[in-house]
Curated annotation (Swiss-Prot):
Region RNA-binding 1, annotated ranges: 61-66, 78-80, 108-110
Species this protein is from: Pseudomonas aeruginosa (strain ATCC 15692 / DSM 22644 / CIP 104116 / JCM 14847 / LMG 12228 / 1C / PRS 101 / PAO1)
A single GO molecular function term of this UniProt record: ATP hydrolysis activity
Residue span(s) of domain Rho RNA-BD: 48-123
Site (RNA-binding 2): K326
EC number: 3.6.4.-
Name the UniProt record assigns to this protein: Transcription termination factor Rho
């Protein structure tokens, strides 16, 4: 019996299973309580149960395996991990653990971890001699992540425009600057599907902070990756806890030389949550931002890096502008210089219903010569020289019009050469 498989089943199927096993009055229970009751029943019959989750170590020294399906929220189906196991395997918050579990004994409330089978998708003995994330050497991104699918569809236009004006590499720290209703959510969906298609070796996590519940559902259905969310009706402490769990998980995977991509929507809302949660220092910046409030969101964003020893952590975060809030402007200004790739979306272009609404002249990647070939770089510069005299709207319209006539960017460059 596997705990994760049960969590992925719809509630109707779980109720049928509980009826078949003779469990009564389950119809009005929460999903986690139904799973808890089912596993307890299975364990009584002597079956082996396996479970997995991401470790969160509490101040008392013990920890719990939280589930990504419930966005790392504490629940009755969490798995208890004892302090002795944490010391023995040198575990830290964010480690992904798979192992055998046992049902709670008399007076216990949680399932407990019996045996560790794997840590961060690797053998437990390999986890002991890994280097800490803080001690790894950061580099500029030097391995390209292509965004174009090459099928010539209209959905592929976003990826192709990004490839032309702001190429993304493994370990990029990118900021998507977006006014309201400029199509940032659709753009993130496109980027997510292109990453899973072109770079299946990357572990993708989409982190939605303070978003609408219907957008979370849509993202879960369109993205073939892990979607972790804290909707706008949750308290700010919850936003902060979710973000910390995600970044810790990503760091632990990078320590095992994995490539991780986090798409964050949005860093502005995360900074607002931290501003509410941290104790007041008495120093307040314009717009009501506490002087120390942005330290942790900066630490989150600054974790993105390409690692010399192997592995990388890429973070693409959206920053909200033109919302009419002074606080949002201050937060954006603080993050403006920290990224090494910027992709501004333009409200005027979006109002004309031209998508993707990217402002090409202002977008770009630092040290893009490390990601592109000499020949491609020259072509991209020539394209910028052609588009620069135009205003934002006519530049993107001209580019989209020309891109629609070809299937791939290479074909587009060849047609440019002929002209």
């Amino acid at each position: 019996m596997n705990l994760t498989e049960l969590k992925q089943k719809p509630i109707a199927e779980l109720l049928e299973m509980s009826d078949a096993m003779g469990l009564e009055n389950m119809a009005r229970s929460r999903k986690q309580d139904i799973i808890f009751a089912l596993l307890k029943k299975h364990a009584k019959s002597g079956e082996e149960i396996s479970g997995d989750g991401v470790l969160e170590i509490l101040q008392d020294g013990f920890g719990f395996l939280r589930s990504a399906d419930s966005s790392y929220l504490a629940g009755p189906d969490d798995i208890y991990v004892s302090p002795s196991q944490i010391r023995r395997f040198n575990l830290r918050t964010g480690d992904t653990i798979i192992g055998k579990i046992r049902p709670p004994k008399e007076g216990e409330r949680y399932f407990a971890l019996l045996k560790v089978d794997s840590i961060n998708f690797d053998r437990p003995e390999n986890a002991k001699n890994k280097i800490l994330f803080e001690n790894l050497t950061p580099l500029f991104p030097n391995e390209r992540m292509k965004m174009e699918a090459g099928n010539g569809s209209t959905e592929d236009l976003t990826g192709r425009v990004i490839d032309l004006c702001a190429p993304i590499g493994k370990g990029q720290r990118g900021l998507i600057v977006a006014p309201p209703k400029a199509g940032k959510t659709i753009m993130l969906q496109n980027i997510a599907s292109n990453i899973t298609r072109n770079n299946p070796e990357c572990h993708l996590i989409v982190l939605l902070i303070d978003e609408r519940p219907e957008e979370v559902t849509e993202m879960q259905r369109t993205v073939r990756g892990e979607v972790v969310a804290s909707t706008f009706d949750e308290p700010p402490t919850r936003h902060v806890q979710v973000a910390e769990m995600v970044i810790e998980k990503a760091k632990r995977l990078v320590e095992h030389k994995k490539d991780v991509v986090i798409l964050l929507d949005s860093i502005t809302r995360l900074a607002r949550a931290y501003n509410t949660v941290i104790p007041s220092s008495g120093k307040v910046l314009t717009g009501g931002v506490d002087a120390h409030a942005l330290e942790k969101p900066k630490r989150f964003f600054g974790a993105a890096r390409n690692i010399e020893e192997g592995g990388s952590l890429t973070i693409l975060a959206t920053a909200l502008v033109e919302t009419g809030s002074k606080m949002d402007e201050v937060i954006y200004e603080e993050f403006k210089g920290t990224g090494n790739m910027e992709l501004p979306l333009d409200r005027k272009i979006a109002e004309k219903r031209v998508f993707p609404a990217i402002n090409i002249n202002r977008s770009g990647t630092r040290r893009e010569e490390l990601l592109t070939s000499e020949d491609e770089l020259q072509r991209m510069w020539i394209l910028r020289k052609i588009l620069h005299p135009m205003d934002e709207i006519s530049a993107i319209e001209f580019l989209i019009d020309k891109l629609k006539q070809t299937k791939t960017n290479d074909e587009f460059f060849d047609s440019m050469k002929r002209k």
